[in-house]
Amino acid sequence: MYTSFDSKQLGTFVADVTDYQQVEAMVKCAVEQFGSLDIMINNAGIGAPKPLLDHDPIADFEPISKVNQNGVYYGILAAGRQFQAQGTPGVILNTSSVYARMASEMTFTYNVSKAAVDMMTKCAALELAPLGIRVCAVAPGRVDTPMLRQYEEIGLWNHIRKEQMRQNFTQPEEIADVVAFLVSEKANCINGCTISASDGFENFKYPLMG
């Protein structure tokens, strides 16, 4: 990325998305560098597989909820306020998951947090529509990232690979292509909904054959 863009096109800002002040400061930094905010992508997310009854109510619920749920809420709020202050339309794109709509073993907190993202997307889209602000979400399935590699460590890598219709993990670049479309003017009619990008993950059960 750094070889493709110069300092006038790309800026960096380290922020803890569980702290609203830091999220707000990130938005202000973008405005100071580029003049305005046009698009906000709330992408930060974490998760760790663990059986529900083995949970520590604090250690296994709060950290995931704070990043996945509070972080998206703070991003929506900070971006929405900036768009309102600018008097300009804008787009807010949240990263959800197929697990927002599906039950699964060992991912209780993650699923709950992503279900919240879907509802925040709907509610924010409704409230912000009069300001010309569009809010939508993308729901990836199994994406080949370091976070997914946790399943290698517990011997489930080949099993989860077969949960895609074509039995291949989605690559991050493929999700980026969907995101680029959703925040573009070509997706102007897409609002208040979550778009699946999962290679059919949620539309079939694990195959008996093959």
Which functions belong to the PLM regions below?
Residues 47-62, 85, 106-109, 149-152, ...:
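Conserved mid-core segment of classical short-chain dehydrogenase/reductases
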Residues 50, 180, 191-210:
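Short C-terminal tail/terminal secondary-structure segment
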Residues 103-111, 123:
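Active-site loop-to-helix junction immediately N-terminal to the catalytic Tyr of the SDR YXXXK motif
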Residues 46, 57-74, 93, 110, ...:
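Catalytic Tyr-X3-Lys loop
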Residues 76, 113, 121:
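Active-site helix of classical SDR
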Residues 129, 134, 190-192:
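Short, small/polar-rich loop/turn modules that mediate ligand/substrate recognition or access, typified
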Residues 81, 126-127, 188:
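Alpha-helical segment proximal to the catalytic Tyr-Lys
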Residues 97:
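Residue(s) in the substrate-gating loop at a strand-loop-helix junction
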